Structure formats: structure tokens, C-alpha cells
């Protein structure tokens, strides 16, 4: 959930990092929050460079990418970098949802594609 401390920090960090990335890079934040809650959080946090998407209804993204925590109906903390041709260029599954991702590794993977 975007309202949890680690998700909050992560999305704010990527929102900040977006300024240094190519305008061809699109950053998406997926959660099982309702779209209304996502919009509220993004507005309150001043997040404009990260688009939030909701997997609340069917959790299809979580199922298809193997990041659904079934018992909690939440998504595991994971980062996917998708190349312009649609192939998966990089992935990072954070073993503990209370930990932040390795931002440097993610940004390096993104910059290699730009």
C-alpha cells in the first residue's frame, strides 16, 4: 500500500529520480490500493512523475508476475524494468517487504536502456 512507510519512501524516491531520466522512461507504481486511494496519496505527496496503477480488482498483475502475496492480497516489493521492445530487461524481488529496493541497481538498469 502506498500509505505504508516503505512504499511511501520508494515511490517518492522514484518520483525524484525521474527528473534525471530520459523523457522516454515511464515509471509505474502498482499496488492493490483502490484507484481513489492512490490518487489521494499521489496528490498529498506531490508525486507527478510516477503513474500509479491499481491491481485491486483482479490482482492480475500480481498473479502474472508472481508477486501476489495470496494470504494478504498484497503485492510483494518488486521492480521490473521493461525494454522498449516489451522484453523484461531487469527484475528485482525484495526478499522482505519492509526493506527498500536497491535503487542504484534499478537506475543503472534503466540508464542502460536509455
Where are each of the predicted segments found?
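Chalcogenol-based redox active-site neighborhoods
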Residues: 1-114
Amino acid at each position: 500500500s502506498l500509505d505504508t512507510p516503505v512504499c511511501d519512501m520508494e515511490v517518492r524516491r522514484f518520483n525524484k529520480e525521474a527528473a534525471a531520466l530520459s523523457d522516454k522512461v515511464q515509471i509505474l507504481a502498482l499496488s492493490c490500493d483502490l484507484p481513489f486511494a492512490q490518487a489521494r496519496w499521489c496528490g498529498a505527496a506531490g508525486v507527478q512523475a510516477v503513474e500509479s496503477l491499481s491491481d485491486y480488482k483482479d490482482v492480475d498483475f500480481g498473479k502474472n508476475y508472481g508477486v501476489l502475496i495470496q494470504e494478504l492480497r498484497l503485492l510483494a516489493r518488486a521492480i521490473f524494468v521493461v525494454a522498449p521492445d516489451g522484453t523484461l530487461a531487469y527484475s528485482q524481488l525484495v526478499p522482505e517487504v519492509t526493506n527498500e529496493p536497491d535503487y542504484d541497481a534499478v537506475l543503472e538498469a534503466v540508464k542502460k536502456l536509455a
